[in-house]
């Protein structure tokens, strides 16, 4: 199986839970042969007494019903995903032993050569040269609230970077569930790009980082040198768009009003220094009034003040840094 096709099936990641949390092959399921505590003990034994002693300890830690339970879970997953691979960090002893145990039970399975480390090195290599990005890239830009994301999603040729990063790409852009690790962000983005079937790629204009997720390698430079199309929307419509996305939809989806207010006040406080005390206090007062009165027009007032006092000034410095811009 080619590395670019690995996310087409749900592979079995045999590494410990903590290793898996740091990054994995997309769509993988974590069924560790050694859990966190066991992996730590085996690692200490390896440093003290070498490979043979570590392997022996591993076998003593995973035997009997524990071993049988593992084999059962692996087998059940393989029944649903017969083309899946097993992998550990380097494609070494953990995956070798797991394959042997399954083979001994009459279950045939392959492991990923070189393991997760090989996959990660391959992902990184895809971004080491800007010439690797061979598609015709088109960037959708515009001031905050101009509807770039909705416009982007109307095209089948698009990749939604903010969706992958689970962040709206702004000071108020934090989403529930947290962001993926940097490794997971790069893994998902790389596979999405390499499996993108169209000659043109449409992306939303983004900063070098989306929340905590950094665009890999030369990706940002490629965006900066690509054709830029700017969406123009009047201020009232922009405030309306932001209201529905950040307030109405959130409350309509069951988010508690007080929790949402506290979240946005925290985001506002993070940019207090850039706003200055007068503007900060004005937005804060309007925001409190809007949430307490549940008044759309007051919401739009604090949103518009935030747009014109912060976001527009920030974006205007970045908007025309690409090589070509069309309105």
Whereabouts are the PLM-identified features?
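Positively charged, proline/Ser/Thr-rich regional signature most characteristic
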Residues: 5-78
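Conserved small/polar residues in nucleotide/adenosyl-binding loops
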Residues: 320-327
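N-terminal pre-Walker A segment at the start of P-loop NTPase domains
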Residues: 109-125
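An accessory alpha-helical subdomain
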Residues: 66, 245, 253-314, 318
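Conserved phosphate-donor/acceptor-positioning beta-strand/loop module used by diverse small-molecule
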Residues: 224-242
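Glycine-rich phosphate-binding P-loop
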Residues: 139-155
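Catalytic cysteine-centered active loop of the rhodanese-like fold, especially the PTP/DSP P-loop
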Residues: 58-113
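Conserved nucleotide-sensing/catalytic segment adjacent to the nucleotide-binding pocket
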Residues: 163-216
């Amino acid at each position: 199986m080619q590395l670019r096709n690995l996310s087409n099936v749900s592979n079995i990641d045999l590494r410990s839970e903590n290793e898996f949390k740091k990054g994995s092959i997309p769509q993988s399921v974590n069924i560790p042969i050694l859990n966190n505590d066991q992996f730590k003990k085996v690692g200490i034994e390896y440093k003290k007494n070498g490979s043979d002693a570590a392997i022996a300890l591993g076998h003593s830690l995973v035997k009997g019903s524990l071993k049988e339970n593992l084999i059962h879970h692996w087998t059940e997953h393989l029944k649903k995903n017969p083309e899946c691979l097993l992998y550990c960090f380097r494609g070494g002893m953990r995956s070798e032993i797991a394959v042997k145990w399954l083979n001994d039970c009459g279950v045939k399975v392959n492991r990923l050569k070189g393991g997760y480390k090989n996959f990660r090195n391959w992902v990184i290599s895809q971004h080491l040269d800007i010439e690797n990005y061979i598609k015709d890239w088109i960037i959708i830009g515009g001031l905050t609230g101009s509807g770039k994301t909705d416009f982007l999603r109307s095209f089948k040729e698009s990749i939604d970077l903010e969706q992958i990063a689970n962040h709206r790409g702004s000071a108020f852009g934090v989403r529930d569930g947290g962001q993926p690790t940097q490794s997971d962000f790069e893994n998902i983005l790389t596979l999405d790009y390499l499996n993108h079937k169209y000659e043109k790629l449409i992306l939303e204009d983004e900063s070098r980082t989306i929340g905590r997720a950094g665009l890999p390698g030369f990706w940002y430079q490629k965006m900066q040198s690509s054709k830029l199309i700017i969406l123009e929307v009047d201020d009232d419509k922009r405030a309306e768009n932001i209201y529905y996305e950040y307030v109405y939809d959130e409350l309509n989806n069951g988010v508690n009003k007080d929790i949402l207010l506290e979240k946005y006040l925290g985001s506002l406080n993070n940019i207090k220094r850039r706003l200055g005390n007068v503007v900060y206090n004005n937005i804060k007062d309007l925001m409190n009034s809007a949430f307490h009165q549940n008044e759309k027009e007051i919401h739009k007032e604090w949103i518009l003040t935030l747009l014109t006092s912060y976001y527009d000034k920030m974006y205007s410095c970045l908007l025309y840094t690409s090589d070509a811009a069309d309105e």
